[in-house]
Amino acid sequence: MQQKCYYEILNVSKTASGVEIKRAYRKLAMEYHPDRNPGDKEAEIKFKEISEAYEILSDDSKRSRYDQFGHAGVNQQSGFGGTGGFEDIFDTFFGGGTSRGSNRSRASRGSDLEYTLEITLEEAFFGVEKEITIPRMESCDSCDGTGSKSRSKTTCHACHGQGTIRRQQGFFAFEQTCPVCNGTGYSITDPCDACYGNGKVKKQKTLKVKIPEGVDNGDRIRLQGEGDSGSNGAMNGDLYVQIIIKEHKIFERRDINLYCEMPISFTKACIGGDIKVPTLDGEVVLKVVPETQTGKVFRLREKGMKSLRGHRRGDLLCKVVVETPVNLSAEQKELLEKFADSLGEDYQSKHAPKSKTWFDNVKDYAKKFFE
Protein backbone atom coordinates (compact mmCIF):
# COMPACT_ATOMS: atom_id res chain seq x y z
CA MET A 1 0.00 0.00 0.00
CA GLN A 2 1.31 3.44 -0.93
CA GLN A 3 2.05 5.61 2.09
CA LYS A 4 0.42 9.01 2.32
CA CYS A 5 2.45 12.19 1.94
CA TYR A 6 3.15 13.70 5.35
CA TYR A 7 2.62 17.22 4.02
CA GLU A 8 -0.79 16.26 2.64
CA ILE A 9 -1.77 14.65 5.96
CA LEU A 10 -1.15 17.96 7.77
CA ASN A 11 -2.57 20.04 4.89
CA VAL A 12 0.59 22.14 4.55
CA SER A 13 2.88 22.94 1.64
CA LYS A 14 6.38 21.48 1.30
CA THR A 15 7.79 24.94 2.03
CA ALA A 16 5.79 25.35 5.25
CA SER A 17 7.66 26.78 8.22
CA GLY A 18 7.99 24.98 11.53
CA VAL A 19 5.39 27.31 13.06
CA GLU A 20 2.90 26.55 10.26
CA ILE A 21 3.45 22.81 10.68
CA LYS A 22 2.94 23.02 14.44
CA ARG A 23 -0.23 25.12 14.02
CA ALA A 24 -1.66 22.64 11.49
CA TYR A 25 -0.84 19.73 13.78
CA ARG A 26 -2.55 21.33 16.78
CA LYS A 27 -5.73 21.97 14.82
CA LEU A 28 -5.95 18.44 13.40
CA ALA A 29 -4.91 16.75 16.65
CA MET A 30 -7.70 18.51 18.51
CA GLU A 31 -10.22 17.50 15.83
CA TYR A 32 -9.29 13.80 15.65
CA HIS A 33 -8.15 13.17 19.23
CA PRO A 34 -9.53 9.77 20.44
CA ASP A 35 -11.00 11.37 23.57
CA ARG A 36 -13.15 13.59 21.36
CA ASN A 37 -14.13 10.72 19.07
CA PRO A 38 -14.76 7.73 21.35
CA GLY A 39 -15.23 4.48 19.42
CA ASP A 40 -14.44 6.12 16.06
CA LYS A 41 -11.79 3.88 14.47
CA GLU A 42 -11.32 6.18 11.47
CA ALA A 43 -10.59 9.12 13.76
CA GLU A 44 -8.12 6.96 15.70
CA ILE A 45 -6.29 6.00 12.50
CA LYS A 46 -6.30 9.62 11.34
CA PHE A 47 -4.88 10.77 14.69
CA LYS A 48 -2.02 8.27 14.40
CA GLU A 49 -1.28 9.48 10.86
CA ILE A 50 -1.26 13.09 12.04
CA SER A 51 1.07 12.27 14.96
CA GLU A 52 3.45 10.34 12.70
CA ALA A 53 3.52 13.14 10.14
CA TYR A 54 4.22 15.74 12.82
CA GLU A 55 6.97 13.61 14.36
CA ILE A 56 8.85 13.63 11.04
CA LEU A 57 8.15 17.16 9.81
CA SER A 58 8.80 18.84 13.18
CA ASP A 59 12.32 17.38 13.30
CA ASP A 60 14.68 19.20 10.91
CA SER A 61 16.92 16.16 10.42
CA LYS A 62 14.05 13.74 9.76
CA ARG A 63 12.29 16.24 7.53
CA SER A 64 15.43 16.68 5.44
CA ARG A 65 15.75 12.91 4.94
CA TYR A 66 12.06 12.67 4.10
CA ASP A 67 12.35 15.47 1.53
CA GLN A 68 15.33 13.71 -0.08
CA PHE A 69 14.33 10.06 0.05
CA GLY A 70 10.62 10.02 0.89
CA HIS A 71 9.32 7.40 3.31
CA ALA A 72 12.35 5.18 2.68
CA GLY A 73 14.51 7.80 4.37
CA VAL A 74 12.57 7.81 7.63
CA ASN A 75 10.71 4.50 7.90
CA GLN A 76 13.52 2.96 9.93
CA GLN A 77 13.37 5.77 12.48
CA SER A 78 9.81 7.10 12.47
CA GLY A 79 7.23 5.97 14.96
CA PHE A 80 7.86 4.49 18.36
CA GLY A 81 9.79 1.30 18.64
CA GLY A 82 11.83 1.86 15.50
CA THR A 83 15.55 1.20 15.62
CA GLY A 84 18.36 1.28 13.16
CA GLY A 85 18.69 3.45 10.08
CA PHE A 86 20.65 3.49 6.84
CA GLU A 87 23.31 1.26 8.39
CA ASP A 88 20.70 -1.48 8.71
CA ILE A 89 19.81 -1.14 5.02
CA PHE A 90 23.44 -1.70 4.03
CA ASP A 91 23.79 -4.55 6.52
CA THR A 92 20.83 -6.30 4.94
CA PHE A 93 22.40 -6.35 1.46
CA PHE A 94 26.12 -6.49 2.18
CA GLY A 95 26.43 -8.41 5.42
CA GLY A 96 27.71 -5.79 7.83
CA GLY A 97 29.70 -8.29 9.89
CA THR A 98 28.52 -11.45 11.61
CA SER A 99 29.52 -10.31 15.08
CA ARG A 100 27.59 -7.05 14.86
CA GLY A 101 24.48 -8.79 13.55
CA SER A 102 24.65 -11.42 16.27
CA ASN A 103 24.88 -8.88 19.06
CA ARG A 104 22.00 -6.88 17.67
CA SER A 105 19.72 -9.92 17.44
CA ARG A 106 20.52 -11.33 20.85
CA ALA A 107 20.14 -8.13 22.85
CA SER A 108 17.21 -6.05 21.67
CA ARG A 109 16.30 -2.68 23.15
CA GLY A 110 12.69 -2.38 24.27
CA SER A 111 10.19 -0.51 22.13
CA ASP A 112 9.42 3.13 22.80
CA LEU A 113 5.85 3.93 23.79
CA GLU A 114 3.64 6.97 23.37
CA TYR A 115 0.92 8.23 25.68
CA THR A 116 -1.37 11.16 24.85
CA LEU A 117 -2.18 13.32 27.87
CA GLU A 118 -4.87 16.00 27.75
CA ILE A 119 -4.47 18.91 30.18
CA THR A 120 -6.15 22.27 30.76
CA LEU A 121 -4.72 25.64 29.78
CA GLU A 122 -4.39 26.48 33.48
CA GLU A 123 -2.34 23.32 34.05
CA ALA A 124 -0.13 24.25 31.11
CA PHE A 125 0.34 27.72 32.62
CA PHE A 126 1.19 26.71 36.19
CA GLY A 127 2.66 23.25 35.55
CA VAL A 128 1.21 20.13 37.11
CA GLU A 129 2.04 16.58 38.17
CA LYS A 130 -0.22 13.94 36.61
CA GLU A 131 -0.58 10.25 37.36
CA ILE A 132 -0.98 8.01 34.32
CA THR A 133 -1.37 4.27 33.85
CA ILE A 134 0.10 2.64 30.76
CA PRO A 135 0.18 -0.92 29.42
CA ARG A 136 3.71 -2.08 28.67
CA MET A 137 5.68 -5.27 28.15
CA GLU A 138 7.74 -6.29 31.18
CA SER A 139 10.02 -9.21 31.91
CA CYS A 140 8.07 -12.31 32.91
CA ASP A 141 8.48 -13.07 36.63
CA SER A 142 7.56 -16.74 36.23
CA CYS A 143 10.55 -17.56 34.03
CA ASP A 144 12.83 -14.60 34.81
CA GLY A 145 12.40 -13.41 31.24
CA THR A 146 13.86 -16.56 29.67
CA GLY A 147 10.59 -17.78 28.15
CA SER A 148 11.35 -21.28 29.44
CA LYS A 149 9.80 -23.15 32.38
CA SER A 150 13.19 -24.57 33.29
CA ARG A 151 14.85 -21.21 32.55
CA SER A 152 17.14 -22.95 30.05
CA LYS A 153 17.65 -22.26 26.35
CA THR A 154 18.89 -24.39 23.48
CA THR A 155 21.12 -22.96 20.78
CA CYS A 156 19.17 -22.59 17.52
CA HIS A 157 20.14 -25.34 15.06
CA ALA A 158 19.48 -23.14 12.03
CA CYS A 159 21.68 -20.13 12.81
CA HIS A 160 23.93 -21.78 15.43
CA GLY A 161 23.17 -19.04 17.94
CA GLN A 162 23.99 -16.14 15.63
CA GLY A 163 20.41 -14.89 15.23
CA THR A 164 20.98 -14.33 11.52
CA ILE A 165 21.56 -16.53 8.52
CA ARG A 166 23.64 -15.67 5.45
CA ARG A 167 22.17 -16.05 1.98
CA GLN A 168 23.62 -15.73 -1.52
CA GLN A 169 21.72 -14.28 -4.47
CA GLY A 170 23.86 -13.95 -7.56
CA PHE A 171 26.74 -11.63 -6.78
CA PHE A 172 25.15 -10.43 -3.54
CA ALA A 173 25.54 -11.99 -0.13
CA PHE A 174 23.26 -10.71 2.60
CA GLU A 175 22.15 -11.52 6.11
CA GLN A 176 18.60 -11.87 7.31
CA THR A 177 16.95 -12.59 10.64
CA CYS A 178 16.78 -16.30 11.33
CA PRO A 179 13.18 -17.43 10.63
CA VAL A 180 13.44 -20.34 13.07
CA CYS A 181 14.34 -18.42 16.24
CA ASN A 182 13.22 -14.95 15.08
CA GLY A 183 16.71 -13.60 15.66
CA THR A 184 17.10 -14.67 19.29
CA GLY A 185 19.82 -17.24 18.58
CA TYR A 186 18.16 -19.89 20.72
CA SER A 187 15.08 -22.09 20.83
CA ILE A 188 12.79 -23.01 23.74
CA THR A 189 11.57 -26.58 24.19
CA ASP A 190 9.43 -25.98 27.31
CA PRO A 191 7.62 -22.62 26.90
CA CYS A 192 6.58 -20.76 30.04
CA ASP A 193 2.84 -20.97 30.72
CA ALA A 194 2.67 -17.31 31.75
CA CYS A 195 4.37 -15.67 28.75
CA TYR A 196 4.06 -18.55 26.22
CA GLY A 197 7.81 -18.49 25.59
CA ASN A 198 7.98 -14.79 24.84
CA GLY A 199 9.86 -13.86 28.02
CA LYS A 200 7.62 -10.81 28.46
CA VAL A 201 4.09 -10.18 29.68
CA LYS A 202 1.86 -7.13 29.42
CA LYS A 203 1.40 -5.27 32.70
CA GLN A 204 -0.19 -2.02 33.82
CA LYS A 205 2.30 0.51 35.13
CA THR A 206 1.32 3.67 37.03
CA LEU A 207 3.70 6.61 36.70
CA LYS A 208 3.83 10.24 37.79
CA VAL A 209 4.57 12.77 35.07
CA LYS A 210 5.75 16.29 35.87
CA ILE A 211 4.38 18.76 33.33
CA PRO A 212 6.51 21.95 33.27
CA GLU A 213 4.87 25.37 33.14
CA GLY A 214 4.61 26.80 29.64
CA VAL A 215 4.17 23.45 27.88
CA ASP A 216 2.35 23.69 24.53
CA ASN A 217 0.20 21.53 22.27
CA GLY A 218 2.26 18.83 20.59
CA ASP A 219 5.16 19.03 23.06
CA ARG A 220 6.51 15.65 24.17
CA ILE A 221 7.98 14.71 27.52
CA ARG A 222 10.44 11.82 27.52
CA LEU A 223 10.52 9.38 30.42
CA GLN A 224 13.73 7.43 29.93
CA GLY A 225 13.51 3.68 30.47
CA GLU A 226 9.74 3.63 31.01
CA GLY A 227 8.91 1.94 27.70
CA ASP A 228 8.79 -1.78 26.95
CA SER A 229 11.34 -4.05 28.59
CA GLY A 230 14.46 -4.91 26.60
CA SER A 231 15.44 -8.47 25.72
CA ASN A 232 18.45 -10.34 27.05
CA GLY A 233 19.69 -7.54 29.27
CA ALA A 234 19.21 -4.76 26.74
CA MET A 235 17.93 -1.35 27.76
CA ASN A 236 14.24 -0.61 28.15
CA GLY A 237 12.57 1.67 25.66
CA ASP A 238 11.43 5.18 26.54
CA LEU A 239 7.96 6.58 27.13
CA TYR A 240 6.98 9.74 25.28
CA VAL A 241 4.09 11.67 26.79
CA GLN A 242 2.50 13.88 24.15
CA ILE A 243 0.62 16.94 25.41
CA ILE A 244 -2.79 17.99 24.13
CA ILE A 245 -4.29 21.16 25.64
CA LYS A 246 -8.07 21.38 25.91
CA GLU A 247 -9.92 24.27 24.34
CA HIS A 248 -10.54 27.09 26.80
CA LYS A 249 -13.88 28.85 27.24
CA ILE A 250 -12.31 32.31 27.28
CA PHE A 251 -8.78 32.27 25.93
CA GLU A 252 -7.21 31.17 22.67
CA ARG A 253 -3.50 30.46 22.76
CA ARG A 254 -1.12 31.49 19.99
CA ASP A 255 2.44 30.62 20.91
CA ILE A 256 2.98 32.41 24.26
CA ASN A 257 0.30 35.05 23.69
CA LEU A 258 -3.35 34.70 24.70
CA TYR A 259 -6.33 36.17 22.86
CA CYS A 260 -9.89 36.79 24.00
CA GLU A 261 -13.00 38.70 23.00
CA MET A 262 -14.07 41.27 25.59
CA PRO A 263 -17.74 42.34 25.54
CA ILE A 264 -18.39 45.87 26.84
CA SER A 265 -21.59 47.84 27.19
CA PHE A 266 -22.76 50.51 24.78
CA THR A 267 -22.39 53.21 27.43
CA LYS A 268 -18.92 52.02 28.50
CA ALA A 269 -17.79 52.17 24.88
CA CYS A 270 -19.10 55.74 24.59
CA ILE A 271 -17.83 57.32 27.79
CA GLY A 272 -15.06 54.92 28.82
CA GLY A 273 -14.34 53.50 32.24
CA ASP A 274 -12.68 50.63 34.10
CA ILE A 275 -13.55 46.97 33.61
CA LYS A 276 -12.22 43.81 35.25
CA VAL A 277 -10.49 41.40 32.90
CA PRO A 278 -9.79 37.76 33.89
CA THR A 279 -6.30 36.36 33.38
CA LEU A 280 -4.84 32.96 34.19
CA ASP A 281 -3.38 34.27 37.44
CA GLY A 282 -6.09 36.67 38.62
CA GLU A 283 -8.16 39.66 37.57
CA VAL A 284 -6.67 42.93 36.33
CA VAL A 285 -8.34 46.30 35.77
CA LEU A 286 -8.35 47.62 32.21
CA LYS A 287 -9.09 51.28 31.48
CA VAL A 288 -11.37 51.55 28.45
CA VAL A 289 -10.88 54.87 26.67
CA PRO A 290 -13.94 56.87 25.56
CA GLU A 291 -15.31 56.30 22.04
CA THR A 292 -13.97 52.74 21.87
CA GLN A 293 -15.18 50.84 18.81
CA THR A 294 -15.80 47.13 18.20
CA GLY A 295 -12.59 45.50 16.99
CA LYS A 296 -10.20 47.62 19.03
CA VAL A 297 -7.52 45.48 20.67
CA PHE A 298 -6.11 46.21 24.11
CA ARG A 299 -2.76 44.60 24.96
CA LEU A 300 -2.10 43.57 28.55
CA ARG A 301 1.63 43.02 28.67
CA GLU A 302 3.02 39.91 30.38
CA LYS A 303 -0.45 38.53 31.10
CA GLY A 304 -0.20 35.69 28.58
CA MET A 305 1.45 32.26 28.82
CA LYS A 306 4.79 31.53 30.40
CA SER A 307 7.58 30.43 28.10
CA LEU A 308 8.72 26.82 28.40
CA ARG A 309 12.29 27.88 27.69
CA GLY A 310 13.50 31.03 29.40
CA HIS A 311 11.72 33.46 31.67
CA ARG A 312 9.68 35.34 29.07
CA ARG A 313 5.95 35.74 29.36
CA GLY A 314 3.52 36.52 26.56
CA ASP A 315 0.80 39.17 26.40
CA LEU A 316 -2.98 39.01 26.67
CA LEU A 317 -4.73 40.68 23.73
CA CYS A 318 -8.37 41.63 24.32
CA LYS A 319 -10.54 42.40 21.30
CA VAL A 320 -13.47 44.67 22.10
CA VAL A 321 -17.02 43.66 21.16
CA VAL A 322 -19.55 46.43 21.84
CA GLU A 323 -22.85 44.85 22.85
CA THR A 324 -26.14 46.27 21.60
CA PRO A 325 -28.69 46.50 24.45
CA VAL A 326 -31.54 43.98 24.28
CA ASN A 327 -34.89 43.51 26.08
CA LEU A 328 -35.39 47.27 26.39
CA SER A 329 -38.44 48.67 28.14
CA ALA A 330 -40.66 51.31 26.53
CA GLU A 331 -39.09 53.96 28.75
CA GLN A 332 -35.57 52.93 27.76
CA LYS A 333 -36.46 52.99 24.05
CA GLU A 334 -37.91 56.48 24.48
CA LEU A 335 -34.71 57.65 26.15
CA LEU A 336 -32.64 56.24 23.28
CA GLU A 337 -34.84 58.02 20.74
CA LYS A 338 -34.32 61.28 22.61
CA PHE A 339 -30.60 60.58 22.65
CA ALA A 340 -30.63 59.98 18.88
CA ASP A 341 -32.55 63.22 18.32
CA SER A 342 -30.00 65.08 20.43
CA LEU A 343 -27.24 64.07 18.01
CA GLY A 344 -28.82 66.21 15.30
CA GLU A 345 -28.84 65.94 11.52
CA ASP A 346 -25.04 66.03 11.27
CA TYR A 347 -24.78 62.80 13.28
CA GLN A 348 -22.58 60.99 10.76
CA SER A 349 -20.05 63.76 10.27
CA LYS A 350 -19.64 64.46 14.00
CA HIS A 351 -20.40 61.25 15.85
CA ALA A 352 -20.00 58.33 13.41
CA PRO A 353 -16.72 58.71 11.47
CA LYS A 354 -16.66 55.13 10.22
CA SER A 355 -20.27 55.30 9.07
CA LYS A 356 -19.60 58.59 7.26
CA THR A 357 -16.58 57.12 5.47
CA TRP A 358 -18.56 54.04 4.45
CA PHE A 359 -21.49 56.03 3.05
CA ASP A 360 -19.14 58.39 1.22
CA ASN A 361 -17.45 55.40 -0.42
CA VAL A 362 -20.83 53.99 -1.43
CA LYS A 363 -21.80 57.30 -3.03
CA ASP A 364 -18.51 57.51 -4.93
CA TYR A 365 -18.91 53.94 -6.16
CA ALA A 366 -22.50 54.51 -7.28
CA LYS A 367 -21.51 57.71 -9.08
CA LYS A 368 -18.82 55.87 -11.09
CA PHE A 369 -21.14 52.95 -11.79
CA PHE A 370 -23.97 55.05 -13.25
CA GLU A 371 -21.86 57.58 -15.16
Swiss-Prot record:
Pfam family of the protein (one) = DnaJ_CXXCXGXG
Keywords of the record, alphabetical order, are:
Chaperone, Cytoplasm, DNA replication, Metal-binding, Repeat, Stress response, Zinc, Zinc-finger
Cofactor-binding details, from the entry: Binds 2 Zn(2+) ions per monomer.
UniProt xrefs under InterPro entries: DnaJ, DnaJ_C, DnaJ_domain, DnaJ_domain_CS, HSP40/DnaJ_pept-bd, HSP_DnaJ_Cys-rich_dom, HSP_DnaJ_Cys-rich_dom_sf, J_dom_sf
Could you tell me where this protein is found in the cell? Cytoplasm
Q: Where does Zn(2+) 2 bind?
A: 156, 159, 178, 181
Q: Does the keyword Lipid biosynthesis apply?
A: no
Residue intervals of the J domain? 5-70
Mention any one GO cellular component term assigned to this protein in its UniProt record: cytoplasm
Query: Which annotated residues bind Zn(2+) 1?
Result: 140, 143, 192, 195
- GO terms for biological process, alphabetical: chaperone cofactor-dependent protein refolding; DNA replication; protein refolding; response to heat
CC cofactor: Zn(2+)
Q: What is this protein for, i.e. what is its function? A: Participates actively in the response to hyperosmotic and heat shock by preventing the aggregation of stress-denatured proteins and by disaggregating proteins, also in an autonomous, DnaK-independent fashion. Unfolded proteins bind initially to DnaJ; upon interaction with the DnaJ-bound protein, DnaK hydrolyzes its bound ATP, resulting in the formation of a stable complex. GrpE releases ADP from DnaK; ATP binding to DnaK triggers the release of the substrate protein, thus completing the reaction cycle.
Domain comment, in the record's words?
The J domain is necessary and sufficient to stimulate DnaK ATPase activity. Zinc center 1 plays an important role in the autonomous, DnaK-independent chaperone activity of DnaJ. Zinc center 2 is essential for interaction with DnaK and for DnaJ activity.
* Stated name of the protein: Chaperone protein DnaJ
